[in-house]
Amino acid sequence: MTTQVVNVIGAGLAGSEAAYQIAKRGVQVRLYEMRPVRQTPAHHTDKFAELVCSNSLRANTLTNAVGVIKEEMRLMDSVIIRAADECSVPAGGALAVDRHEFAAKVTEYVKNHPNVTVMNEEITEIPEGPTIIATGPLTSPDLSAQLKELTGEDYFYFYDAAAPIVEKDSIDMNKVYLKSRYDKGEAAYLNCPMTEEEFDRFYEALIAAETVPLKEFEKEIFFEGCMPVEVMASRGRQTLVFGPMKPVGLEDPKTGKTPYAVVQLRQDDAAGTLYNIVGFQTHLKWGPQKEVLQLIPGLENAEIVRYGVMHRNTFINSPNLLRPTYQYKQRDDLFFAGQMTGVEGYVESAASGLLAGINAARLVKGEEPIVLPPVTAMGSMANYITATNAKNFQPMNANFGLFAPLEKKIKKKAERNEAYATRALETIRNFVNI
């Protein structure tokens, strides 16, 4: 066993996954996490892998690229996906978790590994020796300054936004109905139907509601996957009806008709006592936020247990700075992982940590780091963030559009996606025992 130690900075999804992958390969890990010594504006606990935006890890089927990346990670013994599977709550065709159980489970698996030493302290300088930086969207100012000096690149700022959570007991169950879109999977969502008149009243209140002001030095760059609902609404009345409030596939069983608009609520905890408002990430002030949300049918008396908030996100210009192994181009033993690299989403962040962790372990053991082929979901993400146009680089979720093209063109989308998934999983099996 090598005597070298790998430093992993940050115990979010990427850092926790990286630490676990290194440790299971017989390499010692020092895992640095500044919480609870120093908190961030969005975190509330000292647990690893705390989910701050949503409790959903999104699609769990192989017809979706994020479902494929999860299955690849299962085959590669991902601690994040293992914990998620063990803490899942009903969510139709998606993988959603009880966020508290999930964080506790990840913390337990990583902390209890004999090769992991946890250091609860803030890192303000980049350490020497093998290191993975996985400090996430809320990297501390001191370390941010160090990273900016190291990379010579300006950081980009945008906001992830967290959706409100309400108590189930405060929902008027006579006005909502249980259903998943197109009846896929079990009926897992509470649906709040709106007439056109109700939608108009809601929309006018939403676009007039007061938001928390942004700091002057921060640019308003919103990533489409976590865009505040009021920003979507400002783009036009129909943006919501064709976005998070789209009613297609959600016929009201009481009327047999499709509502004008629908707000969906998704179970947020294993006990089924809390529900988050799907797609309603927001930066509204809390008073106006409550007034707007209580215009939704069924939520007139809703008890909001967590208001929607927004927080900064930070990422580097990976095409200029990183290799597809997640290594820094100017220093072989320095790796980056997580949202800082420009992979967007919980699962994608964890996947980058998995690959960075494997490669850090291989490096200290004198083995060649691996590059996963872009026919795999994980390989396509690594390829995207390192090979795309650096000038217009923006964060990206996993999607089949990033995969290497199929040898034969397939017209039907479902068959094409199935072919992408089959090829990806056949390929990833060659890397399972690395």
Swiss-Prot record:
EC number: 2.1.1.74
Annotated residues for binding of FAD: 10-15
Record's GO cellular component terms: cytosol
A molecular function (GO) term: flavin adenine dinucleotide binding
Keyword Heme: no
Cofactor: FAD
InterPro entries hit by this protein: FAD/NAD-bd_sf, MnmG-rel, MnmG-rel_CS, MnmG_N, TrmFO
Pfam families: GIDA
GO biological process: tRNA methylation; tRNA wobble uridine modification
Superkingdom of the organism of origin: Bacteria
Keywords: Cytoplasm, FAD, Flavoprotein, Methyltransferase, NAD, NADP, Transferase, tRNA processing
Subcellular location(s) of the protein: Cytoplasm
Main location: cytoplasm
Keyword Transport found: no
SUPFAM superfamilies listed in its UniProt record: FAD/NAD(P)-binding domain
Reactions catalysed, as given in the entry: uridine(54) in tRNA + (6R)-5,10-methylene-5,6,7,8-tetrahydrofolate + NADH + H(+) = 5-methyluridine(54) in tRNA + (6S)-5,6,7,8-tetrahydrofolate + NAD(+); uridine(54) in tRNA + (6R)-5,10-methylene-5,6,7,8-tetrahydrofolate + NADPH + H(+) = 5-methyluridine(54) in tRNA + (6S)-5,6,7,8-tetrahydrofolate + NADP(+)
Function noted in UniProt: Catalyzes the folate-dependent formation of 5-methyl-uridine at position 54 (M-5-U54) in all tRNAs.
Protein family membership: Belongs to the MnmG family. TrmFO subfamily.
Entry-linked PANTHER family: GLUCOSE INHIBITED DIVISION PROTEIN A, METHYLENETETRAHYDROFOLATE--TRNA-(URACIL-5-)-METHYLTRANSFERASE TRMFO
Protein name: Methylenetetrahydrofolate--tRNA-(uracil-5-)-methyltransferase TrmFO
Organism: Bacillus thuringiensis (strain Al Hakam)
Gene this protein is translated from: trmFO
